[in-house]
Swiss-Prot record:
Organism whose genome encodes this protein: Salmo salar
Keyword Nucleotide-binding attributed: no
Keywords associated with the record: Nonsense-mediated mRNA decay
InterPro entries: P-loop_NTPase, SMG9
GO BP term, pick one: nuclear-transcribed mRNA catabolic process, nonsense-mediated decay
Record-linked PANTHER family: NONSENSE-MEDIATED MRNA DECAY FACTOR SMG9
Protein known as: Nonsense-mediated mRNA decay factor SMG9
Amino acid sequence: MSESGHSQPGMYGQGRRRRRRRDRDVGPPGQNLSGPSRDREYVPRERRDGSEEPPGPLLQKTPIILAKPPGERSKPSQSVPIGGGQALEKPIMLIKSREDGGKPGTPPEVASPCSGASKLEREGQRPTQPVYQIQNRGMGAAASSGAVDPVIGQTKLVPPEKMKHSIKLVDDQMNWCDSAMEYLRDQTDMLVVGVIGLQGTGKSTIMSLLSANAPEEDQRGYVFRAQTQEIKERGGNQSTGIDFYITQERVIFLDTQPILSPSILDHLINNDRKLPPEYNLPHTYVEMQSLQITAFLFTVCHVVIVIQDWFTDINLYRFLQTAEMLKPSTPSASHDSTGSSGNEEGSEYYPHIVFLQNKSSRDEFCPRNLKKMHMAVDKLMAHSHLKYKGTLSMLDCNIFPGLDRDYLETEVNMFLLPLMENEGEDALTKAGSGSAPLFSLLPGYRGHPTFSSQVSKLRSQILAMSRCQLSHTILTEKNWFHYAARIWDGVKKSSALSEYSRLQA
C-alpha cells in the first residue's frame, strides 16, 4: 500500500500532480489498489476546486442565454457573452438598428436585430412615430427608382396619375364601361361636374378648358375631343355616350353626347339601325336616350352645366323639367335603386344647375339685357327643385364693377362666355383703320372681358361650389363609381321612363 502512494492523501498537496498520476493509471477502475472508497474521497475535492477545470463543459452562463431575444437564439454565429461589459452593449445595438433598419442597403448583420426590435414592439412597446403607407398606381415605379425619404426610410408619396385624355363611361350603345375604375381612389374629397346641351354648343371644348387645357393650346390635344371642321360642315356630332375624365385635384368631369341631336336621329334613320323592342320610332328613342343621360347626371353629379349658344330655347327648359320628373329616387342605405320616381321630396337629392351662355355677343353683356335674362330664367325654373340660384354670381367676379349687389334681384346661376377666338387676331381686326398710327395700334373695343379670363373665373366659381352628399351614405371615389353604375342600370330599367315612352308613342 505504501508503494502505490495512495495510503496517505496528505502527501499529495496539489491536485495537478494528482491528475498527472491518475493519467498514468490506465487500468480499469476495479484494479485500483486504493479501492472504491478512496476514489470517492477525491471527487468532492475536485468539485470544490472548480477553478482548475476547463471552461468548456461548464454551463454557468445559462441564465444569460435565456435572457437573449428570441430572434437571436437560433443564430449559430453569436457566442455567449462572458464578461459583463459586452452584455450591456446589446440593448444599445437594438435601439440603433431599429432606427436604421428600414434604410436600403442595410447589411444582414444589422438588419437581424431590427426583427427582434419589431417583435418587442408587437409585444407591447408602441413605436415612437406611426408610418402610413398609401398604395397607388405610381408607388411601384417610385420605389424602383429609389424615391426614398432619407429621414424615415420610407417611399415618398407620389401624386395621382394624370390622365392624358378622356375615356368612356357609357359607350355609344348605352352600355356601362368599367375602364374608369383604375383611376379612382378611396377618398371622399371629390367633385363631380356634368354637362348637357344641344348639338354644336361647345360642350366638349368648355369641359376641356375647365379640366386640363388652356384656350391657347391646340384643340386637337384637348382631353375631350371637339368637333373637327369636317364634322361641323356635315352637321355631325363628335361625342357619343358619356366621357369620363378626372383631374389630379380629384374633380370628375362627365361630357355627354348632345341632347335631342338631329345627327344621331339621322344616323338611326339612314343606317337602318335596329331599335330596341320597347321603342317603335327613332325620334322617340333619341329623346329617351337624352332623358336617360340627363336624369343620370341629375343623380350622380354635384354640378350640372347647361350650355346654350343663344338665348333662349323654351323647349330646353321643358326638357329639363321632364328629366327632373323622371329622375330616379335617391336610394336609401337599406335597398337598391329601382329607377322609379321618388315620392319623398325632402330626402331627394338635386344638383346645382349652371346656365352657361356660350358664344355670347357684346349686347348680352349689357347690364339691362343681363337683368332681363335672369328674370326670364327665374320664371321658367320657378317650380323646379333643382338648385338653380344662389351658388354662382357674375357680380362677384368683378365683371361689372359699377353694378350693386342688389341690381339683379332675381339672380340665377348664369354665366356668360364670349366667342372663343385668337386675341391677337381680334385686336388686329377690330383696331381702328385710320391714317394715324396711334389708333392702328390700339385694340378694338370688346365690351366684355377676354375669353381666357372669363373661363378662369368660371372655373373658380364651379370648383368653389358646395359638395352636397349624393346619397344617404358618404361615398368615396370608388363607391361613387359603383353607385353611378347602379343608378345607370336603374335608369335604363326605369318604369317611369318606360311609361313616358309609351305615352309619347
